Amino acid sequence: MSAATATGLGATVDVAHEASSIRVGPRSDAADLRVTMGEPLRLAILVGREPANVAAALATSLAANAELVLTLSTTGSGTVIDRASAIREARPNAVLAIADKGDVDGMIELVEALRLACAGGPHTPHLFVSAEDKARVRIGASAGAVPVEAIPAPTTRSAREAVVARLRALRRGGGDIVLRDEAIEAAARSLVLATGRATLVLDVSGESTSLALVRPDGSLIAAHSRLGIGPGADRIVARSGLDRVRRWIPRPIDAPALLERVFNRARWPNAVAPSVLTLALEMALSREALAHLLRDAARAGLDRAALANTRWIVATGDLARFPRAAQTALVVIDALLPEGTTLISRERPDALVVAGAIATRATADVSGMTEDLALVTSLWPKRAITLSVTDESGTIEEKVARGAFFLMPTTGSVRLAFSGSAAREAAAPLVLGVIVDARGRPLDLPPRDAERVPTLARWYSALACLPIEDGSL
């Protein structure tokens, strides 16, 4: 694959993976750009009682792909010593302080706890303060030797982007690199410029998970985390719980055995799934990484419905590299639970990440870098309806009742129509075809293995995701 800008000039990009990098482009001696995760950023948040400021701080943390290690509020209980101990144990690299109007004294108490926590310590975090001018002077004076930098209140789009850019600079260190989350956002923007339609890019790699929604007006909704299906797999278990991963495995497996597999996967950089069970585990981890990030985005006040119901979803990273296209499609459907009709596509290996890296420096050409997998129609009919699918082979009609989940393979361009509705949908040639999902929202899995395993097996078999026999792997 050749990586090129819109002007035709070639560029060579190194894309870092778990324990190696892949070079894409014409040069063999060196790379023009490097895409990496950057340095981990441990972020602590100091906030008041204002809900908008709390949500803005959480959204900033997600946009900057910072690990939120501590949140302290001026309304919380505890002495200065208690707060200082909490900060010292959290070991933040950066602290984001957003002061409410009229509550400067409370923020000063939190900053004094920060100063106490850093006294005599080997590492001093950067303190970013958002407050009115007079209040910021008082807060800065209480910080002592802690370096203080003024930032705008991240409650508006432009201000949040400025704060995120500053936090990302800390992750770059002294290197001239493109952060992977930056490349994902730039790739989404390039796709929107090329197609004119809103695009959600989902990226799941060994060490990170990203959601980047760009609309035709240029607005961006983005969230990133250090959850992954490789070295970041143990983080998923630590934050979501083992049972939430286990519930997606279409076979009975006890918790200790599953936990061992998760931690073994975290210790195997660039591992290729050696068995069907391991592949099912990676699919389960991908679902939970995306679902957890969506929940974090909702808590931060981001538009979860807009993220989940975008009409075009593009998968990148390890999510796009599952051996079967149906595996990518099933993970996206189960994690996002889209409603209506959605087109699911995937990048060609590392193509969009490379294009995104180039797009941070110039205009990138993204034509031919994605392939359309499936047109997914999600519905919950009161009574059975008829779905008509027309492709090059003719028209096929299927009855759809509640609980249905199946694939209708297609050839060439596709058109959809529903009985009793004037709505029509169309798509270019698809790798899989049309996926009909009438399982309902939210998607509830039976808690007992005797019911859960056959249910999952039916869903996997419906899309021919995995070789399943006798109701299990």
Q: Model-flagged regions — what are they?
A:
Residues D176-V201, T209-L473:
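Helical "lid/coupling" subdomains associated with nucleotide-phosphate turnover
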